Amino acid sequence: MSQTLLDNLNKKELTETSCTIEIQAAFILSSLATFFGGLIVLFIFRIALKISRNWKTVKGPRGILELFSSRRIEVNPLRKLYFHGVFRERIEMLLSAQTIVGQVLVILVFVLSIGSLVIYFINSMDPVRKCSSYEDKIVHVDLSFNAFFSFYFGLRFWAAEDKIKFWLEMNSIVDIFTIPPTFISYYLKSNWLGLRFLRALRLLELPKILQILQVIKTSNSVKLSKLMSIVISTWFTAAGFLHLVENSGDPWLNGRNSQTMSYFESIYLVTATMSTVGFGDVVAKTSLGRIFIVFFTLGSLILFANYIPEMVELFSTRKKYNKPYEAVKGKKFIVVCGNITIDSVTAFLRNFLHRKAGEINIEIVFLGEAPPSVELETLLKCHTSCTTFVCGTALKFEDLKRVAVENAEACLILANPFCSDLHDEDNSNIMRVLSIKNYYPQTRVIIQMLQSQNKVFLSRIPNWNWSAGDNIICFAELKLGFIAQGCLVPGLCTFLTTLFIEQNQKVFPKHPWQKHFLNGLKNKILTQRLSNDFVGMTFPQVSRLCFLKMHLMLIAIQHKPLFHNCCSLILNPSSQVRLNKDTLGFFIAESSKDVKRALFYCSNCHSDVCNPELIGKCGCKNRSRQQLVAPTIMVMQSSLNEFAPTAEIYTSISREQTSSVTILTTRNMPVDTADDSDMLDSSGMFHWCRSMPLDKVVLKRSDKATHEFQNHIVACVFGDAHSSLMGLRNFVMPLRASNYTRQELKDIVFIGSLEYFQREWRFLRNFPKIHIMPGSALYTGDLHAVNVEQCSMCVILATPYKALSSQLLVDTETIMATLNIQALRISCPMSGSSKKEVNTSPTFSKYEGKQRYQQIPILTELKNPSNIHFIEQMDGLDEAIKGTSLHLSTAFSTGTVFSGTFLDSLLATAFYNYHVLELLQMLVTGGINSQTEHCLVKEKLYEGNEGGATFLSGRTRCKLGLLSLDETILSDIKPKKTFGQLFCGSLDNLGILCVGLYRMMDEGEHNSERKRFVITRPANECHLLPSDLVFCAIPFSITCDKSESNASIQDQDTTTNVTSMSQGSNFQGAQSALNEHSLSPASAMGEKKSPQLLNSRVYPLNLFDASDIDPGK
């Protein structure tokens, strides 16, 4: 036994000999000589090549060939170059791992490099100052590895275009300092560790190898592998250098200060140094080692402080956000995907969670395509009880399965309104919808869209179902629709906006008008099923009862005709429409608790109740309609005595009719001649004209005398040839609603780049009375050319998205144009004006002895609401609430500014109550909502069909207007001291529904510009002022002017009709439109047809894809 052990020791001594300084120097110098020698040769070759090229330029292209080339090369000098190029190209393909052979070669080189590193680890167990004998078998294995590395090095050198750059690459340095010593060991018959630790740098190729093997596929895994390879290769290389110098000692001391340090101890020392801890149990004693530790500590501060935390974060994030969401039975949740950023999530949570304040019972699962940022992660932690984040995409079935879309209440898709390409953003969201519907067709989807022309693709998805709650929120359609209403009536844009925003900021009003405005902000659009005690009653009766007894303003109902499948939303229906069972009502009220009174109302229990707070659920179970309707009407008649005008007022405008179809008569309908016959689209809802070439509508500054516009609409657009289309068709459609006669339509004059309008024109060419002035709103000459001084409204549309360094600059052009237009004030002396001029100009000062002036009415769109302070400064009023948001600003209260940022809140509205969203779409788009679109697409009604009854009712939509108390038909309502008296009197006698006021800010002298502010749903006891203007829902057949002879000519101050509202049968009007050459058939009940309708013709117009319009028409 002892003899065997002695033999092994003797054998090990034979294979290990002491390495002298000369042997170590031979290994080191071989690498240095190869490196510097090769570098010098390459430099000399490059200099010689430059000299030869210069010589070739001087002596001609054949100068070098004549001196150095043989005759055979002269005969065919390009043949060798051709084969050289082909061979080089094949090598490049091989080394880039683009072929299977190349991939095998790259993987083989990496594996052999790791094998060589393992051999180094084995040899490092022996003392560094000992040399292994060549009889060791491991030495032969390492020699074969390095021989293959030499071959691979030669291929890389051959394929390199820049040889010097290749020579200085890290992989080349590793090969130069590890391959030559191996061949030196073969010559010296001994092997030394030397610089073979540099093979550890080959670990940097690990991410590339893993990608070739398809082990890692995601960006996070690639990033994690790169960080790990950098840290590990740095550890091993630094430990190898310390292992070498500490065991060898300083060269100038002949190794007298060396110490025995194993490779594991070297790794331990490097790790302690990298973490900047340093326990002191293992330290460097050599000068070289200590100098290296100093520089390595500085480098490790960067490496450890950045890479290690990032690796931990990637590893934890991948594990944290890749877990599937566990749906709990009985707990509701929704999935939100698309544009998941800190801004979009903040806006969504603010609006969505506010709807259920105090009782959040719906969990929100965010499906993001990238891990959340630090800010987003912090926000989610603040709502950790109701939010979950999962990394994935809605385009993959496995990710949809992880978030359990099949069990979700709905899937909401967020859009990015600030993206550079709106069309691509819509397309990506449409693909998400298609993926979700393919995965689980019954999933309810609510999607945000940026451009209205892309909505048609969603309706073509086979599993898209409007009736199941699928809905579209189109930013361009709603935003431009709001602005269009503000163009038709001052303040209406603000009035409609206040009904859909949430105001939580606590403010303290300084002026009386601010108190009225803030009280109006408390009101919202709410829905509630009406009590069955209202069955059989007319809408005016129910609305009056709700207003007086419950202090609720009922403005619309959802009605389903007997012979029609689509439910229609009807604003202020006529007395012909009677309520059915479980009718859905739309109210303007402050809280959902208040509108519950309309559900609990009982004619038996609450007929004598005067306090609306006492109306609650009663114990009545069996109710008879015959017993309940009569008492209800008696209550209303008894309450009428206080507000009813005299019997001889407006007896000819009675709303009591027996026909089930609205009949228009000549006594209250403006008359047009046959020469001015209207042409409508096939739905009967919009005015239409034959396709107009663009050059026919382009105006010239020199022709101003030929187009003296008055009472027109000026729209300033800042797009160019490369801007995203904003969809001006959505702006024009509400202004061309068919419930206006052709004479009532206002000219629309666009100012902007002609190149931009050339791209938009195919969507506008079939709308009448549109003009284009090439130019800019920043140039005063262009404004004067379109007679902006005489316009009824000048709207400044926001600039299409541009990539800017600051979001505060997105409204620069808009603000500058506003400043430019506001500077154009028209002043004139008071003495030469007539009373009629004063009455019809609300912006004129009425104080004698003072010079009066008129400011051009402006409506400015802001993309960034924080820029409102620029507009406030222009207004010149110091009455704004300081430090508040846009919706509390003076400019917003007066209706001169609009921002579409509040449209984000409609996503929550669409989920909780999509009926409110449908009402909003109907209000701002001229009568089109999702139900209308569904019927139009399903029945292809835009192709035109025969029959006239539905066409007649298609034009009888209600329209909002702004009426004066003195100069219109409201002047005969007696009494009208309070808003409650006006509401009941106008509803009973005229069928007009009053919903708000447009009041002077101050009757004092300092309000020289006669600015007005909006009051949404005034209180019943609110006292009226003689100067008040009233927002009203006016039936189509009612003439608002006090003089019927001037019914078609309405002054701006006295009567301003606005947006078209879907009157009871507007969906019926979309069902069967007349074809191009047909006339309206006679109505029933022996009524005479209106000449206006007799001369109206209908032409087909695709409401959803304007590009399909036949240009030949």
Curated annotation (Swiss-Prot):
Domain statement: The S4 segment, which is characterized by a series of positively charged amino acids at every third position, is part of the voltage-sensor.
Q: Which residues lie on this side of the membrane: Extracellular?
A: 1-24, 123-137, 187-188, 248-259, 283-290
Which residue ranges have biased composition labelled Polar residues? Answer: 1047-1081
Q: Give its localization.
A: Cell membrane; Cell projection, Cilium, Flagellum membrane
**Gene name, Swiss-Prot/TrEMBL:** Kcnu1
Q: Which GO terms describe its molecular function?
A: potassium channel activity
Name the UniProt record assigns to this protein:
Potassium channel subfamily U member 1
Functional summary from the UniProt entry: Testis-specific potassium channel activated by both intracellular pH and membrane voltage that mediates export of K(+). Represents the primary spermatozoan K(+) current. The channel underlies a pH-triggered membrane hyperpolarization during the process of sperm capacitation, as sperm encounter the alkaline environment near the ovum in the female reproductive tract, thereby playing an essential for male fertility.
User: What Gene Ontology biological process does one annotation of this record name?
Assistant: protein stabilization
